[in-house]
Amino acid sequence: DNLGRLTRLNKSLLLLSKIENEQFQEEAEVDFKQLLHQSLSDFEAIAAHKNSALILLEETEMSYRMNRDLAVILVNNFIKNALVHGTPGAPIHLRLKQHALSITNQGTPTPLKVDDIFARFKKSGTNEKSTGLGLPIAQAIAVKYQLQLTYSYTEGHRFTLTFPI
């Protein structure tokens, strides 16, 4: 549905513009353990529909000062991305350590092009509903809060968000 895609594209571009223009000023300590549990609960039905399991392998108390809405968008983008691009039936593993959050999923059996994954409108798959802006939005949030967002591939696709100490 082209109208739905255009609407999502418009909302994503507006969000990206707001992030880059510092329009999310309100900040507070965000409890990432609580946020992660809420996000996992929110995506549980979608994961079940894809016969996938969202598995929290490790969790530690971790909080960071940032805009709560952007923190929710950041975590949800990673989970949604893993569900959309992951192999149906394969588990998605999440780890929350003292200064890092990582999410690993099975998808294409080859690494993604590191130069392209955070670029706007670059899509690695054939999902026509995708706007190609989820990871660029995550990257913009990471840059705003001095977080390091990295991608690696070793028996699965792993995105890691590292928080400053």
Regions found by a protein language model. Give the residues of each.
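Conserved catalytic submotifs in the C-terminal HATPase_c
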Residues: 28, 53-63
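Glycine-rich ATP-binding loops of the HATPase_c
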Residues: 146-153
